[in-house]
Regions:
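Short, glycine-biased loop/turn motifs at secondary-structure junctions and
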Residues: 1-237
Length: 237
């Protein structure tokens, strides 16, 4: 991930939407990106609320991570505060981004959860999925096996085993849907994180790589961004 100056911007990220920034920032990553880009502020309740210069699938994935991440993990997203505005591209590129987010989620988010749940063969199949068709098929198998194991564990009173299997079913179901909806790719990480918290780092890396596909945001001067964020914090934006 490219190094930036986000660590000195002193902006707090929160889950949910926010009508206006507070003295410490207090917005989601998409709202913070609006401020940093110098665009008129708006509350973001869904990725459709983002300005048209924001890539829809990348905005949806970032928003999904923002709302699902624990407070201690969410600051990782400030690495993208300058990269969402100007990322919108033609439909073919946006479709490529959706496919990348989904395929990467199957290959990199599901395997550690599947291993933990005692499904190493499925974990290896996810890791080695060569394309979207294979990844969808493996995710479908994982969702079915996770659901079946969760039910069987519940009948035996094996609650922890059942919880892991249920997490597999939830995350794998989201992975299958992610090929049509980028927000569901974030739900893959959310479903796995209860048992494999390190997946947040993987999810952030996936977003970083997805932002390298197609059009990229123009670089901005640090001083200009700092002034915009300071003005928003003080209510002058």
């Amino acid at each position: 991930m490219a190094a930036g100056f986000e660590h000195i911007l002193n902006w707090r990220l929160l889950a949910g939407s926010h009508d206006f920034p507070g003295p410490d920032g207090g917005t989601c990553i998409n709202e913070a990106a609006i401020v940093a880009a110098g665009l008129p502020y708006r509350a973001i309740r869904a990725s459709a609320d983002c300005p048209p210069c924001f890539s829809p699938p990348l905005s949806a994935y970032a928003l999904g991570l923002n709302d699902a991440m624990p407070d201690a993990e969410r600051p990782r997203l400030m690495a993208f505060v300058l990269r969402l505005s100007g990322s919108a591209d033609v439909p073919a590129v946006e479709a490529e981004r959706v496919a990348f987010l989904a395929l990467a989620s199957v290959r990199r988010i599901l395997p550690p959860l599947l291993d933990l749940a005692g499904l190493p063969t499925l974990a290896a199949a996810c890791d080695g999925a060569a394309d979207s068709d294979r990844a969808r098929a493996v995710a479908r198998d994982a969702a079915w096996q996770g659901g079946a194991r969760a039910q069987e564990a519940s009948q035996r009173g094996a609650w922890r085993q059942g919880a892991r299997a249920a997490a597999v079913a939830r995350a794998a179901t989201a992975a299958g849907k992610a090929f049509a909806d980028a927000r569901c790719a974030a739900e893959v990480a959310e479903g796995a994180a209860a048992f494999v918290p390190e997946v947040w780092a993987s999810a952030v890396a996936i977003l970083d790589e997805a932002l390298e596909i197609g059009r990229r945001a123009a670089p901005l001067e640090r001083a200009l961004v700092q002034r915009r964020l300071d003005a928003a914090r003080s209510g002058l934006a």
